[in-house]
Amino acid sequence: MVNQQTLTLRGMGCAACAGRIEALIQALPGVQECSVNFGAEQAQVCYDPALTQVAAIQAAIEAAGYHAFPLQDPWDNEVEAQERHRRARSQRQLAQRVWVSGLIASLLVIGSLPMMLGISIPGIPMWLHHPGLQLGLTLPVLWAGRSFFINAWKAFRQNTATMDTLVAVGTGAAFLYSLAVTLFPQWLTRQGLPPDVYYEAIAVIIALLLLGRSLEERAKGQTSAAIRQLIGLQAKTARVLRQGQELTLPITEVQVEDWVRVRPGEKVPVDGEVIDGRSTVDESMVTGESLPVQKQVGDEVIGATLNKTGSLTIRATRVGRETFLAQIVQLVQQAQASKAPIQRLADQVTGWFVPAVIAIAILTFVLWFNWIGNVTLALITAVGVLIIACPCALGLATPTSIMVGTGKGAEYGILIKSAESLELAQTIQTVILDKTGTLTQGQPSVTDFLAIGDRDQQQTLLGWAASLENYSEHPLAEAIVRYGEAQGITLSTVTDFEAIPGSGVQGQVEGIWLQIGTQRWLGELGIETSALQNQWEDWEAAGKTVVGVAADGHLQAILSIADQLKPSSVAVVRSLQRLGLQVVMLTGDNRRTADAIAQAVGITQVLAEVRPDQKAAQVAQLQSRGQVVAMVGDGINDAPALAQADVGIAIGTGTDVAIAASDITLISGDLQGIVTAIQLSRATMTNIRQNLFFAFIYNVAGIPIAAGILYPLLGWLLSPMLAGAAMAFSSVSVVTNALRLRQFQPR
């Protein structure tokens, strides 16, 4: 038995921290899998409860200097309020540190200008540059940035290094040298070392890093806006009918089987079934479907949707954490906390990044000191290398884009189950569309019935056929039963019923052995169908599904069944083709019927006469040719194919089994969601590549420049203050670029 637990993490300063936590959790006995997401500040852990417990995992994380606790319930208003208060307090405290350090740093820079420029500046007294005064002003700045040093010490005790290590070593080295100059200036001069102090550089660096961290925290908070928006859709109260009275109750007190009244203009508070009234309901906020949906007695309604025109009384069927909206929130949370395969590259880099930077800084100091013997130059370049390096940008490049992308998908009624699914969707080459319920409405109806014999015999045959099909759950069977009932027939008892998947059904009705199924299957049973062959072919050529009715081994009638195409089917097929994708239709219908329907929607490749148990094999066959395949379906018999496909896309109007087997779910059932999901995946992955490019180029270019590579050519060195500014804003730029995805709109 394996349990899964999502933990919220606090205290991570960069991606190296996330990698460190992931490694220590993986090393615990009983932990089978662990994924730490720096952007989401969460860890997903799969563990064997017989070998370890959540408390032990938390203790290990706490021992490493971080904080961990189980993911809080987002539906708990009190917990949510506490989290908002905590985040607001944290941002307020960080802002105060930014202001304090910024003001003092400005004063230190102003006081240092005459010394740096070598001239007297009116209005700036020279005593402002006194080392003792600057030391006193720098100490509050170090206190404001104490988290860098505390986290660096924690990392050192664990024999590891993080971004905080780079900051602490860089500013710490500059501070200790400046302190030595302040306390022992003459001794340093006798040693041939310049009596220069770097207090203003230290203060500016810490102020800029704190500013960058403040902006980063604010931006990261915006990436989870989709979750907060979804939760905000839920009604706060409900009008519940109990003992003949209408009571206005908090939504948390509504129970299953309660009768709930919803007036025009009010939100539907819970999932339920209409038991009285008629109305139109706007479901766009949950499903993405723009047109209001008619609702009447017997129809299902979704909590958080908006009742438009009439008054409804509904029977609550799902409340609290079981509602459709709650399940959406849970899926989006899981997707945002998951890790995309492309993240592995950044994880591999951040694993050795900090030690490599420290080594480069030491080498830089040694080379410059040995080359020109100038300790000031050597110190400036070494500190610059330590300060400019930024593993945070690498760590944020992928998770922030994933969080925004999955949240944006939810806005369009597209549930993406994991970051891997979102990444895979942009590589799709072939899209297989199941015909029934995907390209078509999924509500087939009998259009023609032709029987051998007089009217009485026709009615008898229709009654037998409807009776036999009444034992089947196939959509075509339901169509035949509905047609029979509309003709006024009475259903009979059936014995020895048997369903042959992909072929038909058989059984005894009133002592007659009856078979209803495809022409191929009837032929395999030795039943001659030539008497009605011409009509059979004509109906199939018109795109209709035709089944034969045989009694005691002889064909007696045929029925044609049609399922209307969805209004969006033709446009969606064209859109997929414009995206450069190969579109394939899969159906159990015979070749003539399948070709007629495919031609109507513009599909040229058809997989016809495919039994339900063969669908997964058809997907595998396309994959064996090197194709990245997406399967779109809605029924139970589509589940194996959805699981086999590289990306399984379930129509939300279908079965729970199909949805569970899929990677992406289209809540509204609108096929346009397929196009939107692929476009969103491509936009997200483009955004991630941009982020990774910026992060890599920034470090690849920034570190050599800070090390002084341009000095021999241009005589210019990068100031540690500029290095600090560049490092601070590199992470902010990555998060800001990820937030651009919030402007995504399908084309």
UniProtKB/Swiss-Prot annotation:
<keyword id="KW-0460">Magnesium</keyword>
<dbReference type="InterPro" id="IPR023298">
    <property type="entry name" value="ATPase_P-typ_TM_dom_sf"/>
</dbReference>
<dbReference type="GO" id="GO:0005524">
    <property type="term" value="F:ATP binding"/>
</dbReference>
<dbReference type="InterPro" id="IPR001757">
    <property type="entry name" value="P_typ_ATPase"/>
</dbReference>
<keyword id="KW-0067">ATP-binding</keyword>
<keyword id="KW-0813">Transport</keyword>
<keyword id="KW-0812">Transmembrane</keyword>
<feature type="topological domain" description="Cytoplasmic">
    <location>
        <begin position="221"/>
        <end position="348"/>
    </location>
</feature>
<dbReference type="GO" id="GO:0016887">
    <property type="term" value="F:ATP hydrolysis activity"/>
</dbReference>
<feature type="domain" description="HMA">
    <location>
        <begin position="3"/>
        <end position="69"/>
    </location>
</feature>
<dbReference type="GO" id="GO:0005886">
    <property type="term" value="C:plasma membrane"/>
</dbReference>
<keyword id="KW-1003">Cell membrane</keyword>
<dbReference type="GO" id="GO:0043682">
    <property type="term" value="F:P-type divalent copper transporter activity"/>
</dbReference>
<dbReference type="InterPro" id="IPR044492">
    <property type="entry name" value="P_typ_ATPase_HD_dom"/>
</dbReference>
<feature type="binding site">
    <location>
        <position position="638"/>
    </location>
    <ligand>
        <name>Mg(2+)</name>
    </ligand>
</feature>
<feature type="binding site">
    <location>
        <position position="634"/>
    </location>
    <ligand>
        <name>Mg(2+)</name>
    </ligand>
</feature>
<feature type="binding site">
    <location>
        <position position="14"/>
    </location>
    <ligand>
        <name>a metal cation</name>
    </ligand>
</feature>
<feature type="topological domain" description="Extracellular">
    <location>
        <begin position="372"/>
        <end position="378"/>
    </location>
</feature>
<dbReference type="Pfam" id="PF00122">
    <property type="entry name" value="E1-E2_ATPase"/>
</dbReference>
<feature type="transmembrane region" description="Helical">
    <location>
        <begin position="721"/>
        <end position="739"/>
    </location>
</feature>
<keyword id="KW-0406">Ion transport</keyword>
<feature type="active site" description="4-aspartylphosphate intermediate">
    <location>
        <position position="434"/>
    </location>
</feature>
<dbReference type="InterPro" id="IPR023214">
    <property type="entry name" value="HAD_sf"/>
</dbReference>
<feature type="topological domain" description="Extracellular">
    <location>
        <begin position="123"/>
        <end position="132"/>
    </location>
</feature>
<feature type="transmembrane region" description="Helical">
    <location>
        <begin position="689"/>
        <end position="708"/>
    </location>
</feature>
<dbReference type="InterPro" id="IPR027256">
    <property type="entry name" value="P-typ_ATPase_IB"/>
</dbReference>
<keyword id="KW-0597">Phosphoprotein</keyword>
<dbReference type="InterPro" id="IPR018303">
    <property type="entry name" value="ATPase_P-typ_P_site"/>
</dbReference>
<dbReference type="Pfam" id="PF00403">
    <property type="entry name" value="HMA"/>
</dbReference>
<dbReference type="InterPro" id="IPR008250">
    <property type="entry name" value="ATPase_P-typ_transduc_dom_A_sf"/>
</dbReference>
<dbReference type="InterPro" id="IPR017969">
    <property type="entry name" value="Heavy-metal-associated_CS"/>
</dbReference>
<keyword id="KW-1278">Translocase</keyword>
<dbReference type="Pfam" id="PF00702">
    <property type="entry name" value="Hydrolase"/>
</dbReference>
<feature type="topological domain" description="Cytoplasmic">
    <location>
        <begin position="397"/>
        <end position="688"/>
    </location>
</feature>
<feature type="transmembrane region" description="Helical">
    <location>
        <begin position="102"/>
        <end position="122"/>
    </location>
</feature>
<dbReference type="GO" id="GO:0055070">
    <property type="term" value="P:copper ion homeostasis"/>
</dbReference>
<feature type="topological domain" description="Extracellular">
    <location>
        <begin position="180"/>
        <end position="199"/>
    </location>
</feature>
<feature type="transmembrane region" description="Helical">
    <location>
        <begin position="159"/>
        <end position="179"/>
    </location>
</feature>
<dbReference type="GO" id="GO:0005507">
    <property type="term" value="F:copper ion binding"/>
</dbReference>
<comment type="similarity">
    <text>Belongs to the cation transport ATPase (P-type) (TC 3.A.3) family. Type IB subfamily.</text>
</comment>
<comment type="function">
    <text>May play a role in the osmotic adaptation.</text>
</comment>
<dbReference type="InterPro" id="IPR006121">
    <property type="entry name" value="HMA_dom"/>
</dbReference>
